[in-house]
Swiss-Prot record:
Protein name, UniProt field: Ankyrin repeat domain-containing protein 6
UniProt keyword Transcription, yes or no: no
UniProt xrefs under PANTHER family: ANK_REP_REGION DOMAIN-CONTAINING PROTEIN, ANKYRIN REPEAT, PH AND SEC7 DOMAIN CONTAINING PROTEIN SECG-RELATED
Keywords: ANK repeat, Coiled coil, Repeat
Organism, scientific name: Homo sapiens
GO MF, one example: chloroplast targeting sequence binding
Biased composition (Basic residues): 363-379, 622-633
Coiled-coil annotated residue ranges, if any: 417-446, 682-727
Residue ranges with Low complexity bias: 548-557
GO cellular component annotations of the record: cytoplasm; intracellular membrane-bounded organelle; nucleus
Annotated Polar residues bias: 298-312, 566-584
Amino acid sequence: MSQQDAVAALSERLLVAAYKGQTENVVQLINKGARVAVTKHGRTPLHLAANKGHLPVVQILLKAGCDLDVQDDGDQTALHRATVVGNTEIIAALIHEGCALDRQDKDGNTALHEASWHGFSQSAKLLIKAGANVLAKNKAGNTALHLACQNSHSQSTRVLLLAGSRADLKNNAGDTCLHVAARYNHLSIIRLLLTAFCSVHEKNQAGDTALHVAAALNHKKVAKILLEAGADTTIVNNAGQTPLETARYHNNPEVALLLTKAPQVLRFSRGRSLRKKRERLKEERRAQSVPRDEVAQSKGSVSAGDTPSSEQAVARKEEAREEFLSASPEPRAKDDRRRKSRPKVSAFSDPTPPADQQPGHQKNLHAHNHPKKRNRHRCSSPPPPHEFRAYQLYTLYRGKDGKVMQAPINGCRCEPLINKLENQLEATVEEIKAELGSVQDKMNTKLGQMENKTQHQMRVLDKLMVERLSAERTECLNRLQQHSDTEKHEGEKRQISLVDELKTWCMLKIQNLEQKLSGDSRACRAKSTPSTCESSTGVDQLVVTAGPAAASDSSPPVVRPKEKALNSTATQRLQQELSSSDCTGSRLRNVKVQTALLPMNEAARSDQQAGPCVNRGTQTKKSGKSGPTRHRAQQPAASSTCGQPPPATGSEQTGPHIRDTSQALELTQYFFEAVSTQMEKWYERKIEEARSQANQKAQQDKATLKEHIKSLEEELAKLRTRVQKEN
């Protein structure tokens, strides 16, 4: 057996010894090295010894250094376990060692809660003196005073109130201690709370006061005490019920009757002296002192000496008694409390006023003081008025059977009942009027609320419609802007594509012209004599390319034959090609005619300015490239003319060729200028057309938007008229 197993066995034995209170075994096990073990519920030996009340074991464990505030599975400490059983000695020992007083278990209860719940006032007193929190609440929001009031522990309640606990604190349901005591019908606790100036008008979360709770649970004595303490019977709960209506709803007639007489109870509860009691009793006896025959009549006996004068005396006496009772209601309340033969009054009907009650029946109740007679009258109700045999002054008449009948002179005995019914009818009429007034007020308030609600809805609808219209307007404007932007971009793209196509077409035409010109020159070279082939090839290289042969002046230029014929044929072909194009105008034709009729001196002047014209007039890459090459080709010729005079044949051959190229370049320049002007005009026309189309489309969209806005405004007006008609 290992050392750990031995220590575990010793710890288990320590638990058993602490549970059984075996002091010697506990000491031996601690000396042997037993450690603190726990049960399946998480309780230490200190928990077990404190719960079982083994004070020596607790003292030994405390001296051994056991932890005081260890909590079990229910989060209870040893102080909780000792407080549950009310062992004051162990509680005092734990407090002396410095245990935590306000440690809460899983339900939020402290040791003071446990002492108050179980009613251990001495334990509560020890905890309070040690500094326990009197106002601590558990998870349900209950203080220790709530728990003491719930279980009717008056001594613990008194201790807590003296310690400073507040009776008006509410739990999570909104109940005060007075609510709890009224719910569980604890009269002594209610009296204690009322002496501590507890408020009787506090409401819980349902809006109920303590009087509502007593009325709902049929606690008549509690309701009476609360009424004597000044509870308001007109307070309404969340269901809109007063305590009287609550008692009627729960079918509690006794409490309902008590609440209907609440002003009488309040007057009855005021302080009275014996002298006033005796004076009132004497006055009541004097009012009840009647002749013997009237006393007999009041007892319900039938005598032959009944006369109308005695009946009138009884009526006068009853009127005097009613006046006295209305002046002093306390004997009336006393009589109501004493008599038990009174028929039960429903809680749903109004109490009968004293003036409407039958005088004979009241006399019977006051005159019969014998218990047997009271028991006899308790079960039997008074006979109807017509069943009395009345011997008085009467008039004789014969009935249908011919028998002699008698009728009273002073009227029927049903008059009190009729008067009572009339009074009840008037009371019901007043109640109905009051209810109608309250219903009318409620209807007015509801109608006002509905009107405010409809106005608010109308304002919301107006705002929504305005926002919707503005959103649609902005959306339409955005769409128009996007549409115009897209059309503009498409027009620009079309223009760019047309410009590119025109450029490519022009380039193709220029290339074709150059190819034809180069082909004609090659044909002329082929027709020339073999003696001039080398010079003609040198001249072609100088004119066409700017190679290394242009820099060398070894081979002199040779003039080609038939240069005039070539010049005329080249100009005719160029004019035919340019005239065959579809995009040239009248200006281009005039330019061609003028260039064809230029004199020779202007051609020579243009030959000198061929280089600048090429650099300035060309707008394509091909013409831009051909200008410098031709300019470079012309430089050696100029230098040769400036250096040494060339032969006559060379000057005659190079002159026409240079004039042809300069004329072709000038023609292409004029051609591109005409094309560019025509393209600019075409661009302007297209832009104007696109702008006009966009403006027309914007006008159309604007008109449609205005029509849509008008339709929406008409719908809004229809909605407003419909809502007004519904209201």
